[in-house]
Amino acid sequence: QWDPKSPWHDRRVRLAAYYAIDRRSLNEAENLGASRLTRAVVPRKFEFALPLEPYPYDPAKANQLLTEAGYPNGFDAGDFYPYPPYFSMGEAVATNLAAVGIRTKILTMERGAFQKAWLSKKLKGVCFCVHAPYGNAASRMAEFVPIEGSFARGADPDIEALYRQQARETDRKKREAMLHQIQQL
């Protein structure tokens, strides 16, 4: 999303991907329905989490958003890397994306090779990643929001500044408000 020439730079394309993924079916198939669906990287049960409802599975809405963004026939999104060993879940996500025209090529890797390539920020394309640290909203965002985060591939300067500001804030209510603001962006 950080490359202005990439289709992912357009928020409508990113939203289309959200609407294209059938999370309930994935949850049933992969976890026997035991996982709680979430909308963002911060689970609703975490301290300072903004209780956002997950986007519904709506391929028609995904197609509409892609058309509005200028991709009525979809686009080639490049390589798709499922986090080892979640290959079957990655394949299901890639299939959901392909159904609305977001075409990828699945590349699987051994976990050690994946981790090395990912942490050195050498993987390009789409990554289906699994990340489950404990803590609160801030600790969950630590790997995604600041540029040095292991899952970050770019950073919005305003969001990153707000993230750093909340880390220094000692007033709990102000900190919570800042973390909620980040989750809404």
PLM regions: where:
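Structural transition elements
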Residues: 4-11, 19, 36-68, 86-88
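Short, well-ordered beta-strand elements
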Residues: 74-83
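Short, polar/charged alpha-helical segment
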Residues: 88-100
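Solvent-exposed loop/turn segments at secondary-structure junctions
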Residues: 23-26, 34-37, 46-48, 84-87, ...
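Short, solvent-exposed loop/turn and secondary-structure capping segments
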Residues: 28-32, 40-41, 90-92, 137-140
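Sec/Tat-exported extracytoplasmic proteins
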Residues: 4, 21-25, 30-34, 66-73, ...
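Extracytoplasmic/peripheral linker and loop segments enriched in polar/acidic and small residues
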Residues: 15, 27, 99-114, 119, ...
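Paired acidic/hydrophobic, glycine-rich loop segments that form the ligand-binding mouth/hinge
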Residues: 124-130
